[in-house]
Amino acid sequence: MKQVIIDLQLVCENTDNLPSEAQIQAWANRAIQPEFSDVEMTVRIVDEAESHDLNLTYRGKDKPTNVLSFPFECPDEVELSLLGDLVICRQVVEKEAEEQGKPLMAHWAHMVVHGCLHLLGYDHIEDAEAEEMEGLETEIMQSLGFDDPYLSEKEMHG
């Protein structure tokens, strides 16, 4: 089976309780494989300061965020299989997992899957897009053996 090539960058001070490169690889493969094979991407795990800076610079939001996606747009004439970069903030992921009562690795997996789908062009700005993206995320997460990541939200709003 073809693999998504992951360039993993750990630039956070505390690397305890982070997913392994093999876990990130498996999650990214499952999210990306139906669309592409043999693509390369960067997953950069950062602290709040870097996430905050990037979120402010690129999204105008003055706070750290869980995952930022930077798709790579290659000119048509260039043959390059670079999908893009994910920047995931360790502290935000840990805090959200705790607040939402989710297992930490399940939330890490969700952030990788969510970010990969953004790199593939999915979005959640419009309701219809959000529904499609969340449905796909749920399907991928369940195929990886995790619960529906939106279950608690659906219970609260359903």
From Swiss-Prot:
Binds 1 zinc ion. It is an enzyme of class 3 (hydrolase). GO terms for cellular component: cytoplasm. Its cofactor is Zn(2+). Its EC number is 3.1.-.-. PANTHER family: ENDORIBONUCLEASE YBEY, CHLOROPLASTIC (PTHR46986:SF1). This is Endoribonuclease YbeY. It comes from Pasteurella multocida (strain Pm70). The lineage of its organism: Bacteria, Pseudomonadati, Pseudomonadota, Gammaproteobacteria, Pasteurellales.
